[in-house]
Amino acid sequence: MLQPRVEGNDSFNLSVTAYVDKQSRVTMLGSAQVLLEDHSPTALGNPVAMITEPYPHLYEQVSSFLQGVGWHGFANFDFKVDSRSGIPYCFEVNPRIGRNSYYNTSAGMNPMKFFVEDVIAGNSVTPQRLNKRVYYSILPKHLVLRYVDKEMGKKIKFLYRQKKNHDPLYYPAEWGLSLRGLKRLAYVLIARENHWRKYRRNYPVSKFKEGVTRSLDTAELTRL
C-alpha cells in the first residue's frame, strides 16, 4: 500500500474517545490535542502531554461512522492534521479505550461511567460531549515547553495558572506517612525527572528542530 506522507510534529496529532451504548447511541465523545509523544523505542507514539478540547466536526464524523457500522462499546480514534493542507486524516480506530483515556476524566468526564451504566446497570444516560480545556501530562512542564512554539507555551502556562493541569500519577492520597507511601512518592518524582534523560537520548531538541517546529492551531477544529 502506498500513501502520501502526512507532515507535522507531535502537536498535529489528535485523539478522540467515544462510547456507543446498546441502543447505538454515542453517549460519550471526548478529545484532546497531543502536544508531545513518547519517543523511547518501547513506548513510541504514546501521548505524554495533551490539551483537552472539543472538535465538533470530528465528533460528527466519528458518530456517523460508529453508528453506520453498528458499533457497541469504546472506540479510540487517532487523527493527524497535515501541516501543509490543514486537512485532518484518520489514521486508525482502536476497539478499546486508549492508554491515555484519563484525559477525559481530567476534563470532568469519566469514561467508566458510560460503560458501567450501559453494561452493568442497564441504564440509559444523557449523551455528553467534552467541553473543558485542561492540560494533561506526565512530564515536567519545562520539558514540554522545549517542544512547542511560543503560542502553545502560553496556553500551557495559562492552564497552570488556572490550576487546570493534571498528572495521572500525581495522587497525594497514595503518599501517606508509611513506607509504601514514601516509596510511591519517590517513584513518581524519579519517573518525572527521568524523562529529561529519555528525551535527551531519544528525541533531543535538535532533532525536533529539523522538522516542523510550529504547533498546530486548533481554532478551526474547535469552532462550531
PLM-predicted stretches and their roles:
Residues 76-78, 103-104, 128:
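Short acidic alpha-helical/loop segments enriched in Asp/Glu that coordinate divalent cations
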Residues 2-70, 94-119:
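ATP-dependent carboxylate/phosphate-activation module, predominantly the ATP-grasp catalytic core
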Residues 86-88:
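Conserved protein kinase catalytic/activation segment
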Residues 90-92:
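Pre-DFG segment of protein kinase catalytic domains
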